Swiss-Prot record:
Belongs to the bacterial histone-like protein family. This is Integration host factor subunit beta. It comes from Brucella abortus (strain 2308). One of its GO terms (cellular component) is cytosol. This protein is one of the two subunits of integration host factor, a specific DNA-binding protein that functions in genetic recombination as well as in transcriptional and translational control. The lineage of its organism: Bacteria, Pseudomonadati, Pseudomonadota, Alphaproteobacteria, Hyphomicrobiales. The keyword Transcription applies. Keywords: DNA recombination, DNA-binding, Transcription, Transcription regulation, Translation regulation. InterPro entries: Hist_DNA-bd (IPR000119), Histone-like_DNA-bd_CS (IPR020816), IHF-like_DNA-bd_dom_sf (IPR010992), IHF_beta (IPR005685). HAMAP family: IHF_beta.
Length: 94
């Protein structure tokens, strides 16, 4: 599913909302999650999961094509940990 499909589904389930309004709401939710992560904060959606950022320290890597050793810089990466309700639903428990 892509963002536009999500917007269409939400709009169809809520006929009192215009699709443009749903697009704005979904965009605002994603923007706020992104902003919180950029500030180093954790975003928890109970039952669904938690978004956070983790640090990947600098390390030596290898170019798979040439075998040459390269330095990989330190970086921050997004991380998602599923909530119990989501895990249970995916594994058949309801």
């Amino acid at each position: 599913m892509i963002k536009s499909e999500l917007v269409q589904i939400i709009a169809s389930r809520n006929p009192h909302l215009f699709q443009r309004d749903v697009e704005n709401i979904v965009g605002a939710v994603f923007d706020e999650i992104t902003n919180a992560l950029a500030e180093g904060n954790r975003v928890e959606l109970r039952g669904f999961g938690a978004f956070s950022v983790k640090n990947r320290p600098a390390r030596s890597g290898r170019n798979p094509r040439t075998g040459e050793t390269v330095d990989v810089e330190e970086k921050w990466v997004p991380f998602f940990k599923t909530g119990k309700k989501l895990r249970d639903r995916l594994n058949g428990a309801v």
